[in-house]
Amino acid sequence: MSHLVLTPGSLTLKQIREISRGKVTLELADSAIADINTSAGLVQQVLDEGRTVYGINTGFGLLANTKIAADDLQLLQRSIVLSHAAGTGQYMQDATVRLMMVLKINSLSRGFSGIRLEVINFLIALVNAEVYPCVPEKGSVGASGDLAPLSHMCLPLLAEGEMSYKGQLITAAEGLEIAGLKPLELAAKEGLALLNGTQASTALALEGLFNAEDLFAASSVIGAMSVEAAMGSRSPFDSRIHAARGQKGQIDSAAVFRHLLGDESEISLDHVNCEKVQDPYSLRCQPQVLGACLTQIRHAAEVLGTEANGVTDNPLVFQDTGDIISGGNFHAEPVAMAADNLAIAIAELGSIAERRIALLIDSNLSKLPPFLVENGGVNSGFMIAQVTAAALASENKTYAHPASVDSLPTSANQEDHVSMATFAARRLRDMSENTRGVLAVELLAAAQGLDFRRPLQPAVAVAKAKAELRELVTYYDKDRFFGPDIEAATDLLITASYNAYLPADILPSW
């Protein structure tokens, strides 16, 4: 478990990846406390002066012009959390909720939200106790923020809802007891500050980003294995080709392949003077395709890294002037578009991998035994494994349709354009699982092809990757129950061990 002293607005992608993938204890930097207290004091000043300000002493959405009496302000905060906790579907994973909470703490602590330190410390205590609110996956359109998911996340502050502790569902009251907390009475603006924001969609999109990075690394390593297994040429990775075009992602992807394949191997030397002039695109154009995916991954990383440190509730409190201004930072369009770009990249990584599988099992193209098995006919080898890969790749093509172009007005047309960011980000997990499955099949196929090339040896990095797999899955000498082999290869990919094969500074969060 890592310990993080949080200076609001300064989370790095590497820190966020660690929070997403492992447990963390949080401590708020002392430097943040003054701004938090000043911001909360400005909200109280509005009440003391009897002014009417949206989000502090008014209704919400279409009811924004309804002034709320001072005696009802605490009830208003409780009511908004309870009424907006209207999500549905399966609960998000604890890791996702943990990341949501840290992102919310990060945003609230910047001093623009008018929320008391006591409330922020409450959320920190829940994270540190590893007691996580139960948050349904569905119910947000990504504007006005992720209202339903964040409301569910905040129910335990009122001793409402369910929580998750060490894999077990418990009541909020039980969760608060474990964390040593008492329910809070929220003050003016605090309910809205808690449930308004993009932290649910951003957390999901960041998880998608990290999966996309892992898949890019795996695609590069396994793609290099396929080059060797198919006796492909190294010349398409020549740096001069990619410099002539000038696309940074492509240049870096080609460098990755040169790093993995080296200048030569026993396999490459064996076919220097073969009759084959050019390789199929799925081998030859890997830097162009994977490089384009890398560009999208890097762009999404920039957008999501900014969003993770941004303030996305409404209205915002500006300490230098005392102004409290309504805007629209809760609109998650940047997150939605970043997630859409990631979806395209994840789909393409799977699509080209499936084509490499098809190449390897086709003896006319690879010069390997049909379906990568001895005694074909009696044995079917990788025939249906490729069908599985095709099914997964095809499913992702449907998922890759951009979600951000869809919008459905809500709240009596007051919220008349929305981002659909939460779905845009949520589907990335399913898409990542699909592409991981395709790559698992390619990993098995490439290793099988390399075994058929023996005694010739591939590049050092390729041989290492094959050896890691062979510790889990043996050579396929005859037909056997194939499913467990795919699962074992998938489990290997989940470890993200291939990230370490890449040169430094390729992946934004690694």
Swiss-Prot record:
Transmembrane spans: none
CDD domains: PAL-HAL
NCBIfam families xref list: hutH, PRK09367.1
Cross-link (5-imidazolinone (Ala-Gly)) at residue(s): A143-G145
Keyword Protein transport found: no
Protein name per UniProt: Histidine ammonia-lyase
The entry's keywords: Cytoplasm, Histidine metabolism, Lyase
Name of one Pfam family that matches: Lyase_aromatic
Gene: hutH
Alphabetical list of HAMAP family matching this protein: His_ammonia_lyase
BP GO terms, sorted: L-histidine catabolic process to glutamate and formamide; L-histidine catabolic process to glutamate and formate
GO terms under cellular component: cytoplasm
